[in-house]
């Protein structure tokens, strides 16, 4: 069975992985100032950071509309026996709803709610591509993805709250206080939504080390076959702290490093770093 895997650009997989596994992305719309850009195509995190650092507001993201999804799916629906599109969490965006509406135009397009974002979504996308390469049927892959979605854990540590404040996701006073006290919040996807789960204090590398210990120490329920390290212009020492923690606690067989894209990076800001893995069945 000839199966095509597609996803929303929020999955933040590298160009190398996309080429290797023949994965195609539907770009999110990024609204910055008076202009609209396509995530990963006409705008990248560095562009957002330069805009915000120059005094501009953080960008807003918007889903592609159903007609755009129809146009996106059409060539793949004609070329492949089946198309499986893995969407950003339905609780975070209307991408899933719009993709489902578009999929109704085709008999061979399925849409899966990843219940995640960034490489939490990317974890499912890469698994789907590997299963397709192994010869699984589209029905089997979709069933596996639905079972996997609520076992994927995404979390990260923010270096600052300035970008969250500018986007309206926290108050400027809270951001100022957190930055003044050196507080680094840790966010995670819980039930398809981003929530603050812990707060650390100190330099970012020290906070990252504590974050990894809290996340992995003493656990025996983790699937150690694959882990993502996702970062956005990581600060010195942070990548080393993450990898040291993974070696100590995780014993992961495959460590994949990826860059956080425009959609999440525009809210979290530079310095953000985290990991993604799945729990055992």
Regions found by a protein language model. Give the residues of each.
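Class I S-adenosyl-L-methionine
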Residues: 36-105
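Short beta->alpha junction loops
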Residues: 63, 113-115
């Amino acid at each position: 069975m000839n199966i095509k895997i597609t996803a929303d650009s929020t999955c933040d997989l590298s160009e190398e992985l996309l080429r290797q596994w023949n994965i195609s992305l539907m770009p999110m719309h990024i609204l910055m100032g008076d202009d609209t850009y396509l995530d990963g195509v006409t705008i990248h995190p560095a562009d957002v950071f330069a805009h915000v650092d120059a005094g501009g507001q953080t960008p807003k993201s918007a889903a592609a509309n159903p007609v755009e999804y129809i146009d996106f799916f059409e060539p793949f629906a004609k070329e492949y026996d089946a198309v499986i599109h893995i969407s950003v969490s339905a609780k975070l965006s209307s991408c899933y709803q719009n993709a489902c509406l578009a999929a109704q135009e085709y008999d061979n397009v399925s849409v899966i709610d990843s219940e995640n974002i960034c490489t939490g979504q990317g974890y499912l996308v890469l698994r789907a591509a590997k299963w397709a390469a192994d010869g699984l049927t589209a029905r089997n892959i979709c069933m596996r993805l639905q079972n996997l979605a609520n076992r994927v854990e995404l979390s990260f540590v923010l270096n600052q709250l300035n970008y969250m404040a500018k986007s309206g996701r926290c108050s400027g006073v809270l951001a100022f206080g957190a930055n003044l006290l050196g507080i680094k919040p840790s966010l995670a996807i819980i039930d398809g939504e981003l929530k603050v789960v812990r707060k650390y204090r100190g330099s970012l590398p020290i906070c990252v080390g504590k974050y990894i210990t809290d996340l992995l120490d003493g656990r025996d329920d983790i699937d150690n076959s694959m882990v993502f390290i996702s970062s956005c212009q990581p600060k010195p020492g942070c990548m080393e702290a993450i990898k040291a923690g993974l070696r100590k606690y995780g014993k992961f067989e495959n460590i994949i490093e990826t860059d956080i894209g425009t959609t999440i990076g525009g809210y979290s800001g530079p310095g953000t770093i985290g990991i993604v893995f799945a729990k055992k069945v």
